[in-house]
């Protein structure tokens, strides 16, 4: 199978005991553009995959020529790592390069009448949750998010624009050439000077006004007709099954080997409270253990290691180094024997 771009081959561990099958697969690919990784080593974190590197990730079949072993090893974390290693518009294929087919929601393949087993259905669900989509040919494709275009939001300003236009039109009927026609007492209308405008009475410096009718450059005729759509309740987006799933910790948040797990600054995921509660529980357990080791005054006994009735010429040198004088020539020697008399005269030992 000739392919262009970098290719990653994911092999189950059972294929390593059949080198002839593995060599057959490797012969059909260009070695300088092909990498081979074992799924069990990836699952245990012994090796890592580079991000946005491969154009095609190929899942190899096991020794039984099925993908059962491969599906059983591909958990959620490993699938996300594989998807991150794909480039935008990269594809996830199997060894036979057969299309995965489209699922109809009941676990059935639109291209065949068989029903997927639990591992296959779980694999299909996990790759979709990881961000892959099915293209027109039934292949799993990583969408190119960077190629998508941003759509500007339409602000509902149609009513305000219409009211503003009607107000200006009605004002124009009464104000002409800076005067307002007002009825007089004799039935003759008399011109009255109009109010001063902002040109005649400018706004004082440092004073600003907010125009809430501003449409931010979006024409009123381009506004959406259904601007008052029903809002989606965010509490209904996740059900109990989603809330009970295990949280996947990002690699950058995992503690390094041999180091204690620490929470980020301004932690909002609950890890800080969890670690604080764990520390309090450990401190309480240690304090409780220390309480059992404390002894009362009645349980303490004083031990005297002094040899009774044995003194030297100074009164202490026969008891050992701890009781000898600073200038005693016997410092560093064992204690005298019981009953042995020692006398010092001019710093000379007299036995």
Swiss-Prot record:
Residues 253-269 are annotated as: Fe-S binding site A. The keyword Repeat does not apply. InterPro entries: Anamorsin, CIAPIN1, Dre2_N. It comes from the Eukaryota. Residues 314-328 are annotated as: Fe-S binding site B. Residues 93-118 are annotated as: Disordered. Residues 105-114 have a biased composition (Polar residues). Its cofactor is [2Fe-2S] cluster; [4Fe-4S] cluster. The keyword Iron applies. A motif (Cx2C motif 1) lies at residues 314-317. [2Fe-2S] cluster binds at residues 253, 264, 267, 269. Residues 152-243 are annotated as: Linker. It is found in: Cytoplasm; Mitochondrion intermembrane space. Keywords: 2Fe-2S, 4Fe-4S, Cytoplasm, Iron, Iron-sulfur, Metal-binding, Mitochondrion. Pfam families: CIAPIN1 (PF05093), DRE2_N (PF16803). GO terms for molecular function: 2 iron, 2 sulfur cluster binding; 4 iron, 4 sulfur cluster binding; electron transfer activity; metal ion binding. GO terms for biological process: iron-sulfur cluster assembly. A motif (Cx2C motif 2) lies at residues 325-328. Residues 1-151 are annotated as: N-terminal SAM-like domain. GO terms for cellular component: mitochondrial intermembrane space. [4Fe-4S] cluster binds at residues 314, 317, 325, 328. The C-terminal domain binds 2 Fe-S clusters but is otherwise mostly in an intrinsically disordered conformation. The N-terminal domain has structural similarity with S-adenosyl-L-methionine-dependent methyltransferases, but does not bind S-adenosyl-L-methionine. It is required for correct assembly of the 2 Fe-S clusters. Monomer. Interacts with TAH18. Interacts with MIA40. Belongs to the anamorsin family. Component of the cytosolic iron-sulfur (Fe-S) protein assembly (CIA) machinery required for the maturation of extramitochondrial Fe-S proteins. Part of an electron transfer chain functioning in an early step of cytosolic Fe-S biogenesis, facilitating the de novo assembly of a [4Fe-4S] cluster on the scaffold complex CFD1-NBP35. Electrons are transferred to DRE2 from NADPH via the FAD- and FMN-containing protein TAH18. This is Fe-S cluster assembly protein DRE2. It comes from Ajellomyces capsulatus (strain G186AR / H82 / ATCC MYA-2454 / RMSCC 2432).
């Amino acid at each position: 199978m000739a392919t262009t771009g970098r290719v990653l081959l994911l092999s189950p561990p059972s294929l390593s005991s059949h080198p002839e099958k593995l060599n057959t697969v490797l012969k059909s690919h260009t070695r300088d553009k092909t990498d081979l990784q074992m799924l069990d080593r990836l699952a245990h974190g012994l090796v890592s995959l580079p991000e946005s590197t491969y154009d095609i990730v190929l899942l190899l079949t096991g020794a039984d020529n099925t993908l059962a072993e491969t599906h059983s090893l591909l958990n959620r974390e490993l699938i996300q790592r594989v998807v991150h290693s794909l480039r935008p518009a990269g594809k996830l294929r199997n060894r036979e390069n057969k299309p995965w087919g489209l699922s109809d929601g009941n676990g059935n393949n639109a291209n065949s009448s068989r029903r997927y087993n639990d591992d296959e259905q779980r694999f299909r669900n996990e790759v979709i949750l990881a961000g892959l989509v099915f293209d027109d040919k039934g292949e799993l494709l990583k969408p190119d998010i960077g190629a998508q275009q941003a759509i500007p939001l339409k602000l509902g300003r149609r009513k305000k624009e219409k009211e503003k236009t009607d107000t200006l039109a009605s004002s124009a009927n009464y104000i002409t050439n800076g005067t307002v026609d007002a009825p007089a007492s004799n039935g003759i209308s008399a011109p009255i000077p109009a109010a001063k405008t902002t040109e005649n009475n400018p706004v004082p410096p440092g004073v600003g006004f907010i125009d809430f009718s501003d449409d931010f450059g979006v024409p009123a005729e381009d506004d959406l007709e259904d601007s008052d759509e029903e809002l989606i309740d965010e509490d209904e987006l996740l059900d109990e099954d989603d809330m009970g799933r295990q949280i996947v910790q990002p690699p950058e948040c995992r503690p390094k080997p041999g180091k204690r797990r620490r929470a980020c600054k301004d932690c909002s995921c609950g890890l800080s409270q969890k670690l604080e509660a764990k520390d309090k529980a450990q401190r309480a357990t240690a304090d409780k253990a220390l309480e059992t080791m404390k002894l009362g005054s009645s349980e303490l006994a004083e031990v005297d290691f002094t040899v009774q009735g044995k003194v030297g010429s100074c009164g202490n040198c026969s008891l050992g180094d701890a009781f000898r004088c600073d200038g005693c020539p016997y410092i560093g020697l064992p204690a005298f024997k019981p009953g042995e008399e020692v006398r010092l005269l001019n710093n000379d030992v007299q036995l």
